[in-house]
Amino acid sequence: MINDVKFCAILTMRYINKSLMQSCHDNIDAHMPPPPKGLIAMRSFHISPDRGMSIFYFDTNENLNAAFPSMKEFQQYVAAKFHAKADAQKAITSSQSDFGEC
């Protein structure tokens, strides 16, 4: 088991028109803001042809809370531009249930 806790932002996107996903990725690559303070890792996932998810890991809850509004704002901008529905959540990893490193 892993003993340290990570503070996370989980951002999801569902594209109304799944053919826009690659254009959206290209736009994000070109316009991604600099990494926020305390960001230690990010993992992105394709869930289905029209859905994606990214998990951002922060070192402290304070850094997550400071970064979350601007992350959400950027996500909403992208969702509006590429006809998608976005959701953002905060989470804390479970040191009791974690296993391995990714």
Question: Where would I find each of the regions flagged by the language model?
Answer:
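Short S/T/G/P-rich N-terminal loop/turn motif that feeds into the first structured element of a domain
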Residues: 1-53, 59-73, 80-102
